[in-house]
Amino acid sequence: MSEATFDEAALADELAAILAQLIARPSTVPPGDTRTIAAFASQRLRSAGYTTETASRAEGLDNVVATLGSGEPWIVFNVHADTVDAGNRADWRTDPFEGVREGDRVVGLGAANCKGGMATHLWLADEIARRGGPSKGRVSFTFVADEETMGPDGTRFLRDAGLVRPDILIIGAPTANRMVVTERGVLWVRITTTGRGAHAGDPDAGDNAIVRMGRVIRALEDGLGPRLAERRDGALASTMNLGLIRGGNNTNVVPAGCLAEIDRRLLPGEDVDAAFAEIAEIVERAGEPDGTVRTERLLGANGFSAPVDRGAVAAFGAAIEGRTGVAAAFAHTIGASDGRYFADDGIEIIVFGPGDDAEGHAANESVPIAALVDAARIQIEAVDTLLGLDRPSG
């Protein structure tokens, strides 16, 4: 499709307007209620000719699945509709729920993470329908809840319920329109130590659970730390972080309990089950008395890596180069996307979208309108390559 087929100024206005409409529909966590914004997306895509379904496993956490076409390949575009809270309103120069256009940017809560990406997906869905839909295969758009809390009631629910079984999954996220095709896995582990309470004036009469936790943590640092230091894959590292520790209830009491939670990030070649077993084995070897230490897995998913020279990655790469005039750049993220729920399915997963991740979760969050336009143009070209669209939009 030629550059002349789009009025770029009109496209910029359309995308900015869609984004403002999304920002004006709060979906903050807590409580993460996506019913209003999901209804908006569902109605828009149903009007465009999509078959739509709104599905939820938890009250208020609505997820939309909108599909056009049939058969294979099945491309699923996914983006989360929930946002973090706006925080202190005094830190915002505009109403965070207004979607204000300031020069060449749109400012508002979720502008970068991830309502900017959602705006481009809604436009993309409309444009695919305007061009007659896929000539082969099908495309689905999913707008999900429960991402900001890494919860199970958004993308994971859609996969578990069998509502989407993609061959290609495109996760909308603020990557500055660069592709992320390799993502680390994630494992959260909780360790609980128990002891025996006593008066602090006679600590030997008790058994200090915090001190016990200290020994367990030291065992993990000494036993796992050196191993992780040797596990690297280019710019990616295998990591462990002690992110939370909580114990005791008063300064003058020997604590009878302590809890710690650990975040492990895994290279795509590592296995989440093996990573948990490795932690549990080191904790066991710490030598604490039986029944005084418990290790449990809170959540876990493997990482993923897509081939960079074929399939969807090649289609996106060609579209990016066609739009920007330079070869596609690949990015890495320190976080985890909802793509992790499909990491073991043997499919292509790409994380891609407008905006800078550093803008997310901050006051005066914004996204460049030009980045929205680029994301929209790149994605429609990639879909055209992968599914074939019947006619250009004029």
Task: For the regions a language model picked out, list residue spans one by one.
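A structural signal for isolated positions on well-ordered beta-strands in alpha/beta enzyme cores
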Residues: 53, 76, 140-142, 294
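N-terminal helical capping/dimerization or prosegment-like subdomains
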Residues: 2-89, 257-261, 275-278, 315, ...
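Acidic-glycine-rich active-site phosphate/pyrophosphate-binding loop
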Residues: 86-101, 166, 181-192, 350
